[in-house]
Design a protein with these regions (language model features):
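A short secondary-structure junction motif
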Residues: 41-49, 114
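Asp-based, Mg2+/Mn2+-dependent phosphohydrolase catalytic module
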Residues: 2-6, 105-106, 110-189
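Substrate-recognition element of Asp-dependent hydrolases with the DxDx(T/V) motif
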Residues: 66-113
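Active-site neighborhood of HAD-like aspartate-dependent phosphohydrolases
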Residues: 1-40, 44, 58-63, 167-168
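Hydrophobic alpha-helical core bundles mediating ligand binding, dimerization, or RNAP-core interactions
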Residues: 21, 35, 52-57, 73, ...
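Short, basic/glycine-rich phosphate-binding loops at helix/coil junctions
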Residues: 33-35, 55-56, 60-70, 122-125
Length: 189
């Protein structure tokens, strides 16, 4: 059985941070002090969802409730990439085991399960919030290999993460607009 390490944001679904910033009245070019730290701390599991919401309440300086912050944060996740969906279906038809390999947080893990039509077919995952580090950290790649072994293919949209995979000897491919179609064509050949 072949193994795919699959990033989520920018590969399985579109990310729309601009909608989050708009909902919180934040300027993405001039984020308030503490925003990036709170984001990273949440992404690596240093703080939980409640603390993240409280931190954002203080950072935003507005009277947003935890529920409003949650709703705004969920706007980060947009729509499923149907080209990726078709690629995954073809891989499953050929017996591939697919594992999510993503920098993400509990709220987004919960949300992507509602957005991705195939999410229940991918119960296995390595998430940054569980590992305590983000890609391209060695800790993420090591955690994946210790649990699942070295993947036959790794797809990610971020070049720095692809470079991290290559450093670990992975067959890493940067995901672009045409990657899913190219891989589908190769599978049919």
């Amino acid at each position: 059985m072949k193994l795919l390490a699959l990033d989520i944001g920018g590969v399985c679904l579109r990310l729309t941070p601009e909608r989050v910033f708009q909902s919180m009245n934040l300027d993405p070019d001039n984020l308030p002090d503490g925003y990036e730290k709170a984001y990273l701390d949440y992404s690596i599991g240093k703080i939980g969802s409640w603390q993240f919401a409280k931190d954002l309440q203080a950072i935003v300086g507005q009277s947003m409730t935890v529920a409003q912050i949650h709703d705004a944060w969920m706007k980060f996740l947009d729509t499923e990439d149907l080209k990726t969906t078709r690629l995954l279906e073809a891989l499953w038809d050929r017996g591939w085991h697919i594992v999510f390999f993503s920098d993400t947080q509990p709220w987004h893990i919960e949300g992507l399960r509602d957005i991705l039509s195939y999410s229940k077919r991918i119960p296995d995952a390595i998430y940054s919030c569980d590992v305590g580090a983000e890609k391209p950290s060695d800790a993420m790649f090591t955690a994946f290999e210790e649990r699942y072994g070295r993947p036959d293919l790794y797809l990610d949209d971020r070049l720095c993460n692809i470079e991290g995979g290559l450093r670990h000897g992975w067959n890493a491919v940067q995901f672009t607009e045409t990657t899913a179609e190219q891989l589908l064509a190769e599978l049919k050949a």
